[in-house]
């Protein structure tokens, strides 16, 4: 059975309350609950991790090297700033899909660049919470 890790970056713990015009009204808990149901259907193990701290995300990626087959990551604000998370993903060489609830290319200019997209298997942006479900489906397909 494949192991898939979902990583959510800073402020995503505030989903449902924070800027619903950009991020929707679902909470992160709602999104993860839906993913867990889908993971059961796909017969994969799903692990969830959220942190507002860059170093904690780096450490979780590093510990994934031994038992995780695929990563789905929404780096949130770290998308545009974190060489450290990029280096961690590059080091472990675990395939990953980058997910964004909003379309980062329709936002402020500083939000349009990602430090991860060129390393990712794919990028899903602007589709809201369903983007996570699409990423999980794609991860399962890529692991076949």
From Swiss-Prot:
It is an enzyme of class 4 (lyase). It comes from the Bacteria. One of its GO terms (biological process) is chorismate biosynthetic process. PROSITE patterns: DEHYDROQUINASE_II (PS01029). Transmembrane segments: none annotated. Keywords: Amino-acid biosynthesis, Aromatic amino acid biosynthesis, Lyase. One of its GO terms (molecular function) is 3-dehydroquinate dehydratase activity. Pathway: Metabolic intermediate biosynthesis; chorismate biosynthesis; chorismate from D-erythrose 4-phosphate and phosphoenolpyruvate: step 3/7. It holds the Pfam family DHquinase_II. Disulfide bonds: none annotated. Its EC number is 4.2.1.10. Substrate binds at residues 74, 80, 87, 101-102, 111. The keyword Nucleus does not apply. The record marks 18 as: Transition state stabilizer. HAMAP family: AroQ (MF_00169). Belongs to the type-II 3-dehydroquinase family. Homododecamer. Catalyzes a trans-dehydration via an enolate intermediate. This is 3-dehydroquinate dehydratase. It comes from Hydrogenovibrio crunogenus (strain DSM 25203 / XCL-2) (Thiomicrospira crunogena). The lineage of its organism: Bacteria, Pseudomonadati, Pseudomonadota, Gammaproteobacteria, Thiotrichales. The gene is aroQ.
């Amino acid at each position: 059975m494949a192991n898939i890790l979902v990583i959510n970056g800073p402020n995503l713990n505030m989903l449902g309350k924070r800027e619903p015009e950009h991020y929707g009204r679902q909470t992160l808990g709602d999104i993860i609950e839906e993913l867990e149901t889908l993971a059961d259907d796909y017969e994969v193990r799903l692990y969830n991790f959220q942190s507002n701290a860059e170093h904690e995300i780096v450490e979780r990626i590093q510990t994934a090297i031994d038992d995780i087959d695929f990563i789905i990551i929404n780096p949130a604000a770290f998308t545009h700033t974190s060489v450290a998370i990029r280096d961690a993903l590059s080091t472990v060489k675990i395939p990953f899909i980058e997910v964004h609830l909003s379309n980062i290319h329709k936002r402020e200019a500083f939000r349009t660049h990602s430090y991860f997209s060129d390393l990712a298997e794919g990028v899903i942006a602007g589709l809201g919470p369903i983007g996570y479900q699409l990423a999980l489906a794609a991860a399962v397909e890529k692991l076949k």
